[in-house]
Amino acid sequence: MVGQRAQHSPVSLLLLIHLCLLHLRASGQPHPTPEAPVEEVVSVQGVRGGSVELACGSGPAPLLVLWSFTPLGSLVPRPVAVTDGAMSKVEAIASALGVVSLRNSSLVLGELHEGARGHFLCQVLHVAGGQLHAAYSHLTLAVLVPVSKPQVRLSNPSPVEGASVVATCAVREGTEPVTFAWQHRAPRGLGEALVGVTEPLFQLDPVNRTHLGWYMCSASNSVNRLSSDGAFLDVIYGPDKPVITMEPLGLTEEGFWASEREEVTLSCLAASNPPSHYVWLRDHTQVHTGPTYVIARAGRVHTGLYTCLARNSYLDTRTQTTVQLTIYYPPEGQPSCAVHPSPEAVTLLCAWPGGLPPAQLQWEGPQGPGPTAPSNVTWSHAAAQLPSGSVFTCTGQHPALAPPALCTVMLWEPLGRPTCWSTATMGDQFIMLSCEWPGGEPPATLGWLDEQQQPLGGSSSSMAVHLLQAQEDLAGREFTCRGTHLLRTPDPHCHLQLEAPQLDVAEPRVSVLEGGEAWLECSLRGGTPPAQLLWLGPQQQKVDPGTSGFMLHPEGAQLRLGIYDADPAHHRGTYQCVARNAVGNSSQSVLLEVLRYPAPPNVTISRLTYGRHRREVQLQWAILGPGNLTGFLVQRKASALGPGAGAWETAASDIEPESRGRRLGGLDPGVLYAFRILALNHHTAGHPSEVKIPADPPFSAYPAVLGAAGTGMVVATVASLLVFQYAARHPETFPRLETPTTTPGLDPAQETTDSPVNVTITVTATP
């Protein structure tokens, strides 16, 4: 009965019962039911901001569930929520715990607050065996707080190397126990854990440059684990003593070396924080600022002491390092090889002076390497042990040159034999004996010998020259040139015999027609030294290449003389071909005859008359007798009868031989001219014709009369027509003498009228 009433009682009754139960429970009095209530104690954990469900034990369906909360440190319970299964009520004070709701008999706390930390009591009324029973559940709720994001604090973020630094990992909140861990990461490295450091703070004493970098800490508890952002520990240090490096690298005992004309890069590094400021000095003079000094094209002037100054601007500390830089340069050009022969041995010389350091030279021959020395090296060999074609190489090595420089000598004997010749010098005052034997290494030695095999002067290499005073008694004498070479036995030689020149002419007598072309030929036969050929004209004058009317044409040992447009007055006569050398001369004569062409026939003028206005004449002529001709020549002059008589001048030339007439213009009407004509056979002119003066053309009246008559007839005809026209229009002007009779059968229109008409026609003839 009690259970049924309880199920149907209002909430106010429930709360009243609840309060009673709380009162009884709080007062420690026993439950009014005959049996003691069942109690359960449970510990529950929740996370702040999270959700937790508090269960109210297990058993039969409750009639009433009452939840209360007692904060830590308090003895007074506070009602939280009540439900009878149909209705539920959450007290306003429950918001301090979070978002409170009931799920059946369980109390659900969402968005858990730290204020929910304490003791929860669940009281349940239920019916069992027809009796009302009360059950109690005690729950202790622990609210856990996650650790907050830790923060690293450094006692000195920028300490000087050697000082003391304390690092602290600060956490604002978090349920104990909280565990700490530390990590260090260099600026250009990976992070590494600091083993053994688990406290919220640790000390670096003394601090050094290896401690520079980022420091991070992490904090963790039973709820979570968070890591801090990095805090940078900037350790101030340096600068250390600078270290100088060079590219490309070349090391010497004093420092570095570099090749001339290459790019050289000097780098300076001094460990420092903040980074060092660098200054470069060359021989105590500043040349650059910055860690790298580049010499774009190294030269010899760049040799010297280079100092790198490093400065820490924060600490105002300085360090420096000095090195020696030497610019190497090879000797100029290439090694030079030379051979100095002697009768029984050969000396090989190799020289390559200059350079820094001096080049190292070494000989190498067919049997292997030879001596070595700087700048120059000498090697001697017995001539008997050296076959022709032996090759010797001198190798020059220098640090500034990648490939070695070489010079090579190949010993070989010259080909063939010596060649001898002679020439005259200084106007044939001296005779130069020359001897040549080219090729060979070393070159052959040559010397001249007289007829008694006595040396003439000294000897020389490859070519020997000896001068003799020119005189006639040298003709017929023989000289010998002897050559010697260490690889050639016996000694070869050549002979030279001096002799006067001899001449031959193709034809001693040459004929040519006037105006033609003639060639005189002269050939040189023998002569040592070589002779000079020339031609002398009929007046013994020398014919030069530029002489007018002549042409010289040398062909080997011949000298041809050409005569153009032969003229008897200038070209006829005896020509001499002369050959001269330093030991004698000779000459040959050639007679040149210039023949005239036969005379052409005579010419007579058949007609010579003036043209219009006396400014031209018409000339006609005729040939008298047989003969060859090639043209005509017309001449004129002012007649002696006129005011200005003068010499004959050409009026027309180049007239074809077939022509028999010519119109000549360009006359002055005020001058009286005389004309004559000549026949031409090439350059031969015939006898002039008779001299004639132009005549006026004859008068002809017949054409004038005919012209006048024709003109009169035209005028008469025109006048008659005019008279007839006038009479027809004015008949009264002309009276009739009698009346005409009419003939029967005659048409009036056919009547004739014999009216006389007088017409006067005047004809004037002008001659």
Curated annotation (Swiss-Prot):
Residues 739-754 have a biased composition (Polar residues). The keyword Membrane applies. It is a single-pass membrane protein. One of its GO terms (cellular component) is plasma membrane. SMART domains: IG, IGc2. It comes from the Eukaryota. Residues 1-28 form the signal peptide. Its main location: membrane. Residues 34-140, 150-234, 242-324, 399-499, 501-593 form the Ig-like domain. This is V-set and immunoglobulin domain-containing protein 10-like 2.
